[in-house]
Amino acid sequence: MICFVILYEVKLHTEHISFNTKDKIEIVNITDEVERVLKESGIKEGLCLVNSMHITSSVFINDEEEGLKEDFVKWLEGLAPYAPDKYKHNLTGEDNAHSHIKRTVMGREVVVAITGGKLDFGTWEQIFYGEFDGQRSKRVLVKVIGE
């Protein structure tokens, strides 16, 4: 039996993307910024983690189409409307329980394969930051791992 062991050095590159949101609920396409971080990393094969650094926001993959973004907001508002007296969490003095629920439904992060130095998307796929308690400074972690 012949066994081969291939050793290579794994590279890591971490960067935070910072931006301000204008609205309480907002969906922002961050694909270009993530691609910039990937290019700066020099990594050609691996994985790219994109992670919201806030408990009331989300990172997800979908299509860049305005009607679809409006549909997401409408659906999420139907699921967890802004209603301060509806949620027990808001008894703590907060008024953003609806934002926590929206984040849980939409997810915290995405991981995208890197192939040939590019994000390996399906047709129409883009990376979005979903803000559910906005109008302030926000951060997204991008961690690129590979060779």
Region roles according to the model:
Residues I2-E147:
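Active-site histidine-anchored catalytic micro-motif
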